[in-house]
From Swiss-Prot:
GO terms for biological process: fatty acid metabolic process. The gene is mmaC. NCBIfam families: PRK05857.1. Disruption phenotype: Deletion of the gene cluster mmaABCDE causes a significant decrease in the intracellular accumulation of zinc in Sauton's medium where metal concentrations are relatively low. InterPro entries: AMP-bd_C, AMP-bd_C_sf, AMP-binding_CS, AMP-dep_synth/lig_dom, ANL_N_sf, ATP-dep_AMP-bd_enzyme. It comes from Mycobacterium marinum (strain ATCC BAA-535 / M). It catalyses: a (2E)-enoyl fatty acid + holo-[ACP] + ATP = a (2E)-enoyl-[ACP] + AMP + diphosphate; a (2E)-enoyl fatty acid + ATP + H(+) = a (2E)-2-fatty-enoyl-AMP + diphosphate; a (2E)-2-fatty-enoyl-AMP + holo-[ACP] = a (2E)-enoyl-[ACP] + AMP + H(+); (2E)-decenoate + holo-[ACP] + ATP = (2E)-decenoyl-[ACP] + AMP + diphosphate. ATP binds at residues 218, 308, 312, 403. This is Fatty acid--[acyl-carrier-protein] ligase MmaC. It is an enzyme of class 6 (ligase). Its EC number is 6.2.1.-. Keywords: ATP-binding, Fatty acid metabolism, Ligase, Lipid metabolism, Magnesium, Metal-binding, Nucleotide-binding. Mg(2+) binds at residues 169, 313.
Length: 531
């Protein structure tokens, strides 16, 4: 793949040798600052503590995250042993954490200090498992043990294909699945960009980055580990800080990666303050469809942007839409980008809906519209302890994303929704993302999302929930609804026009920003009935 070290930790240790005094990790409020030399020492310390609890290559270690430096330290301590960091948000209900443990069977627990879940409040199922609180510079308490300084950076024989972490998919519905990610997941795409000399997404050695995305989310974990491998100063935390703008300015941040809801928040703050972030060079975004006006505003301040598309299962990003002359027009049309060199994509048409994959007997050439399959060097290893689901989603190295996309002649791909969310009305397939996109092009609409309304005659009708750009009285709300309806009459076929339009205060979304359409339907119904 490259002449660089074959594991994430080895690459970070290489940076520690080059810049030992440089800060590797720090909270956005200035606390928990950890130079690269101390990061390496703390990794040794906690790896020793884990080894004393019988953790070894292939063992699972539950990492209860607070998204701060200690969380990433815990991941790297696992990496030194070849153990697998099982990521769990410290704000999750104990029952959910208990379910994660039933799936992964961890041998130890590492708890970040800002987690709401502590060693005394762990689920009953974890009572017999050693729990270690991760505190920078304080040793390991009752589990203090001689550090692993006499051992190599990682266990001998570990390589790019060895597992590093598990992330549970949030999804919009269904049983949680533990996505098993290899070391290569976190550097395959950056290596491609560097080798190809492409500036779609760029990292500069030693720059300052900030990620508000959780370490339990592929975007958060991937972004911070990638920047650590480039010797960057990684700012973390701040989930409860009211101002993104303040964090970026006070820490002189050069690069950041946001979900579209946070991008909208940042734009709102910058507009209100009539200011910019002078240090900011690059803003990446992804997880759900962005509002083109927000991207246009950021680019007008001189900041380069890059939309990244992918899933936990594809190792974060597989397609990219960087700043170019007509990128805003592409975003307005629903584009999510084009594949990186070395990433293969395939659109399976409706008549290939059996899910057998691009290499199946009888599979035709990639369609212009269909379910997207991705073959990337960053793809997951599979779902932990779930071979049946793995065989359904990962076939011959190809991941079935479940997303419906359309390929245009310019080589860019445009998202239309998820195959599982397709609304079928009178036998016609309606792509939810296309309905959403049309509504968000109406002046006065901040965001919008459609949902399914059961109907005895057509099977289903389209409902639309809208968040207005400003507060409005009943008369203004009626006027906005009429404007939206008129826009659909001009822009869409009749079957895809909303039969009901509801003004709501917010669109329910997953942690990664994806619309929770079932919850949205319930919320819209409650608004209509006055519940």
């Amino acid at each position: 793949m490259s002449d660089l070290p074959a594991t994430v930790l080895e690459r970070i240790i290489e940076q520690a040798q080059r810049r030992p005094e440089a800060i590797a990790l720090r909270r956005c409020d200035g606390t928990s600052a950890l130079p690269y030399s101390e990061l390496a020492a703390e990794v040794d310390r906690y790896a020793g503590a884990l080894r004393a609890q019988s953790a070894s290559r292939g063992s699972r270690v539950l990492v209860i995250s607070d998204n701060g430096p200690e969380t990433y330290l815990a991941v790297l301590a696992c990496a030194k042993l070849g153990a697998i960091a099982v990521m769990a948000d410290g704000n999750l209900p104990p029952a959910t954490i208990d379910r994660f443990c039933q799936i992964t069977d961890p041998v130890a627990v590492l708890i970040a200090p800002g987690s709401k879940v502590g060693s005394s409040s762990l689920p009953e199922g974890l009572a017999a498992i050693p729990a270690i609180r991760v505190d920078i510079g304080s040793g390991t308490g009752e589990f203090a043990h001689s550090p692993d300084t006499d051992r190599p950076a990682t266990e001998p024989g570990l390589g790019a294909d060895d597992p590093l972490a598990m992330i549970f998919t949030s999804g919009t519905t269904g049983e949680p699945k533990a996505v098993l990610l290899a070391n290569r997941t976190f550097f395959a795409v950056p290596d491609i960009l560097r080798n190809e000399g492409l500036n779609w997404v760029t990292w500069v050695d030693g720059e300052t980055t900030y990620s508000p995305l959780p370490a339990t989310h592929i975007g958060g974990l991937w972004w911070i580990l990638t920047c650590l491998m480039r010797g960057g100063l990684c700012i973390t935390g701040g989930e409860n800080t009211p101002s993104l703008m303040q964090i970026l300015n006070s820490n002189a941040v050069n690069t950041t990666c946001l979900v579209p809801t946070l991008l909208s928040k940042l734009v709102s703050e910058l507009k209100s303050a009539a200011t910019t972030v002078p240090s900011l060079r690059l803003l990446g975004y992804g997880g759900s469809r962005a509002i083109a006006a927000d991207v246009r505003f950021i680019e007008a301040t001189g900041v380069r942007t890059a939309q990244v598309y992918g899933l936990s299962e594809t190792g974060c990003t597989a397609l990219c839409l960087p700043t170019d002359d007509d990128s805003i027009a592409k975003i307005e049309a629903g584009a999510v980008g084009r594949p990186y060199p070395g990433v293969e994509v395939y659109l399976a048409a409706d008549d290939e809906a059996d899910g057998a994959g691009p290499n199946a007997p009888g599979a035709g050439p990639s369609a212009s519209f269909g379910t997207l399959w991705i073959k990337s060097p960053a793809n997951m290893l599979g779902y932990w302890s779930n071979p049946q689901r793995t065989q359904e989603v990962l076939i011959d190295g190809w991941v079935n994303t479940g997303d419906l996309l359309e390929r245009h002649e310019d080589g860019f791909f445009y998202i239309k929704g998820r195959s599982s969310e397709m609304i079928i009305s009178g036998g016609v397939n309606i792509a939810p993302d296309e309905v959403d996109r049309i509504a968000e092009g109406v002046p006065g609409v901040r965001e919008a999302a459609c949902f399914e309304i059961p109907d005895p005659e057509f099977g289903a009708l389209v409902g639309l929930a809208v968040v207005a750009a400003t507060d409005m009285d009943a008369s203004a709300a009626r006027k906005l609804k009429h404007t939206i309806a008129a826009h659909y009459r001009r822009e869409s076929e009749s079957v895809a026009r909303p039969s009901t339009i509801v003004i709501v205060s917010e669109i329910p979304r997953t942690q990664s920003g994806k619309v929770m359409r079932t919850s949205l339907a319930a919320a819209a119904n409650q608004v209509q009935t006055g519940g």
